[in-house]
Amino acid sequence: MSRKQLALFEPTLVVQALKEAVKKLNPQAQWRNPVMFIVWIGSLLTTCISIAMASGAMPGNALFSAAISGWLWITVLFANFAEALAEGRSKAQANSLKGVKKTAFARKLREPKYGAVADKVPADQLRKGDIVLVEAGDIIPCDGEVIEGGASVDESAITGESAPVIRESGGDFASVTGGTRILSDWLVIECSVNPGETFLDRMIAMVEGAQRRKTPNEIALTILLIALTIVFLLATATLWPFSAWGGNAVSVTVLVALLVCLIPTTIGGLLSAIGVAGMSRMLGANVIATSGRAVEAAGDVDVLLLDKTGTITLGNRQASEFIPAQGVDEKTLADAAQLASLADETPEGRSIVILAKQRFNLRERDVQSLHATFVPFTAQSRMSGINIDNRMIRKGSVDAIRRHVEANGGHFPADVDQKVDQVARQGATPLVVVEGSRVLGVIALKDIVKGGIKERFAQLRKMGIKTVMITGDNRLTAAAIAAEAGVDDFLAEATPEAKLALIRQYQAEGRLVAMTGDGTNDAPALAQADVAVAMNSGTQAAKEAGNMVDLDSNPTKLIEVVHIGKQMLMTRGSLTTFSIANDVAKYFAIIPAAFAATYPQLNALNIMRLHSPDSAILSAVIFNALIIVFLIPLALKGVSYKPLTASAMLRRNLWIYGLGGLLVPFIGIKVIDLLLTVCGLV
């Protein structure tokens, strides 16, 4: 992936975010964040009080009140800036995608076949079901399915990957995306969406996040913050009559400052930015999430369903051994296996030819000179081979060869059954070779488990995540590979129905399930899974069923998706812990200062020995504003993430963000108080 990464504080983004922060000062924008709306009202109230004091309409220190008012407005601006900067980064990423959209014309065919009469129409007028022709050099005008032809397609504008991909009719590689370019040949495409509903349109809308809905956890946290704010609002409101009864009423400006320092403004100001940044980080991994809900669900996932091929193993099975049947020498088996594989262009077939050459110096023969009939592999027969000089040689799965032998009046040897089981237990795939009705032996095809994958699964296990390998292999082979890879469980001989049933079973147990898929047959399971990552190279049905799309089409990305989701949840939790711990420290600064005149005994709480009541209150308000700015990078980048158990993670966060939240305000408020005193500002 080569998509350009944005700097955290890109100058143009910062300038734009500052402008947006000022625009967000209007009440319509502010009421969406209840905590910051209280600060906004406090800012407005203290501004009015400052003006009244300056005009002589009210008694009091107009300069002090104006300073408090100014820093309260700055607090609101900083919170707006954090959200605007996160949104600006997402919009910048969306703008790079908008550059892919081009106003162009399309050749709309009157009949669904190559060579039919074509009408030139604007691409944005194409409707679902329309048939278009695209040739080398053309931009594909719509999302759709290839119904005829095959071509090399440059998808770098969407995926960031420069290597072209093949798109052709039939199978799982028939889906094309509007905005990509044909490099060679031609395609006849049936449009699958209406204007404004293309994959690119959805990507842009999702990335911009203009209509980003709050996730369930975000709503729950917002309710908690509102509850805390109401409690502190009521507590602060009752303080005025107490102080008035004591003979020295506390000013409204001080009460507003006290309220703002008590309520959780830090997390209140950063909450939206954390959510927007989570989706932005997902895009940085080249994964498009349909909503923040999908990203959040990724953080709560506790079961991963992983395809064996390409995710756990390298996916290119290689012939590793010839195991002859009783009474057959290994060279005879190798010669027959090589002959049966001469026309087999699959990686497995080529590896059989090469292994026979390496073991017994059996040179690859000229296919044309053999005057033989080659039998291709089909899904029905599940075997392939060659007919040459009255010899009928076949290689294939155990069941297919067994049926072939019995159909030709032969008997499948018991010793070969044992050898098949032995190969399967070692994690390899057995292919049986037969000549006529005589079974010659077994070829072991070994799929290599990816390096480091066992360690990654161990990390996931530490985090309480169960890993389940999905494979079409038989149970013996699946069990051996599962043991080698270190997964917790496996589903062998998997079918779409079996996958769907397994997901429902885990969900019935109260678990959240994540999986990947690329084919139409994966669509039901993708639709059922809590986190469903569809491959961009997959079918349209798979992409529509999933709630995320991996532009790199890398099944291993599912593990990274879970990490990003957990990092977002950890960031939100860590900053909430820091914010609430912050408030405890601010009590010691502002409460003694606010009520020292009325209740001198409260001076015992002035453990920071701040210069004066005015400097203490102003220092706390200034710190309350500045801490939001200092935490913006953490909100956007996310807290440092390490795979740990839930209890270990909780202890770590309490030490770092709980204790840090207690200590930092003591230091910060004291330093600000000293600076105000030295500069003679209080």
From Swiss-Prot:
Gene3D superfamilies reported in the protein's UniProt record: Calcium-transporting ATPase, cytoplasmic domain N, Calcium-transporting ATPase, cytoplasmic transduction domain A, HAD superfamily/HAD-like
Membrane-crossing residue ranges in chain numbering: 34-54, 62-82, 219-239, 254-274, 588-608, 616-636, 656-676
Pfam family, one: Hydrolase
The entry's keywords: ATP-binding, Cell inner membrane, Cell membrane, Ion transport, Magnesium, Membrane, Metal-binding, Nucleotide-binding, Phosphoprotein, Potassium, Potassium transport, Translocase, Transmembrane, Transmembrane helix, Transport
Family annotation (SUPFAM superfamilies): Calcium ATPase, transduction domain A, Calcium ATPase, transmembrane domain M, HAD-like, Metal cation-transporting ATPase, ATP-binding domain N
GO annotation, cellular component aspect: plasma membrane
Enzyme class, first EC level, given as a word: translocase
Positions of Mg(2+) binding: D518, D522
Known role: Part of the high-affinity ATP-driven potassium transport (or Kdp) system, which catalyzes the hydrolysis of ATP coupled with the electrogenic transport of potassium into the cytoplasm. This subunit is responsible for energy coupling to the transport system and for the release of the potassium ions to the cytoplasm.
Family the entry assigns: Belongs to the cation transport ATPase (P-type) (TC 3.A.3) family. Type IA subfamily.
Subunit structure: The system is composed of three essential subunits: KdpA, KdpB and KdpC.
Protein name per its UniProtKB record: Potassium-transporting ATPase ATP-binding subunit
Provenance organism: Escherichia coli O9:H4 (strain HS)
